[in-house]
Amino acid sequence: MARIASVQTEPIYYDVRDRALNPYSPDFDAAQVIEQVRRPNVEKQCERLRQAGENRADLVVLTEGSEVMGNWCQASDRPEARAQVVCEIPGETTEAYGAIARQYSMHVVAGLHERVGDTYYNAAVLIGRDGQIIGKYHKVHLTQAERAGITCGSDYPVFDTDIGRVGILICYDWIYPESLASLACNGPDLVCFPTHGYGWTEDLGEVTAKCRAADHSVNVAMAMTPSKFGPGRSCIVNRAGQIVADAGYHRDCIIYADLDLRLQRYDKFFVDESISDLGGRLFVDRRPETYKILTMEQPPALEKHMAQEHVRRRHEPEQRLARAHAGWAYDAENDRIME
C-alpha cells in the first residue's frame, strides 16, 4: 500500500499594482518578487510537505504553479523581468522540495514554472525519495493568457517509482479527454493533477474526476487551489471512479488515501460476466483505426466553430498579450499601470 497525499492550500497573494512587483513598471525590482512572492509561497508549500511527511505520505501532490510565477511567465514583452524571477529546473525551488522529500523518504509532485533559456513552461516535477528529480512534464494545453509567453508541451510521459508508474497532467489538460486517454496509453498507475481548479462547475468537475479515472482504470490525485480561481475540492479517486479522499471547498488542508497502486480493477462488465482486469479488457478491445479523426488538424467541426469571430481571434498574438496585460492592470496604449 502507498499513502497518497494531495495538498490544498491557498497561495500568498500579491498586488499587481505594486510597482516593485509589476514587470511593466519602471520601478520593477526582481529581488522584491523573489522575497515577497516566490520564496514565501515555496516555504508555505514546504510546510505542507513537512506535515505530509510526518503523516508518512509516500507521495505528495502540490498545486499548479506552487511558486506563483505564472503571471511573470506570461509577460513575454518584458523578457528581462521574467528571466530574473522564474527558476530553472533543477533550481532553488526543486532543491527546497527535494530536501524535504529526502528527509521524509517520500515522492513529491509539484507544479512549477520553468525557464529553459528563453523558453518558459508550465511544468510539474516528480521528485524521488532521495530528493532527486525523476522526471518532469510540460503542460500541453495552455489557456489564452498563458500562450502569450509560455510554450506548450508535446507528450505525456510516465515515470517508474517504487510504488507504481506515475503520470502527470496540469489544469487545462483535464478539460480535454484526449489528454488522459493519451497518458493512459503509457500505462500509469497514478495520475497526479496539480491545478487551480476543475475548469468546470463544481458538480461537473466531480463527474469528470470520477469518469476520467473510471474510463481509463487509473488512480487520480488532484491538488487544487482554494482561491479566486475556484473553491478547491482536491480529491483522490481510485480506478473504479470512487472518490476515496475529499478536501471539500474553501479549506486549507491535506487529504490522504492508502492505495495499492498496482492493484488492477477486477469486476464485471454488464455484457461480460467474466471477472477480469477491466482496464485491460478495455484496452484490448480498442479500435484505434477508427479514431483517426481525433488527430486531424482540421476536423469538420472546427470549420463551424471558426466561423465565430470570437473563437477565430482567440489565439491571435495581440489577443493573447492583451490578456496577459490585463492580468497586470497594464494599459499598453498609454504605457501605464492602471490604478
Report the location of each language-model feature:
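Conserved beta-strand and immediately adjacent loop positions that scaffold enzyme active sites
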Residues: 3, 109, 123, 155, ...
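Active-site catalytic loop in hydrolytic enzyme cores
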Residues: 86, 99, 115-189, 195-211, ...
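Short beta->alpha transition motifs characteristic of CBS
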Residues: 72-75, 125, 137-143, 235, ...
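A solvent-exposed, charged loop/short amphipathic helix patch at secondary-structure junctions
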Residues: 17-37
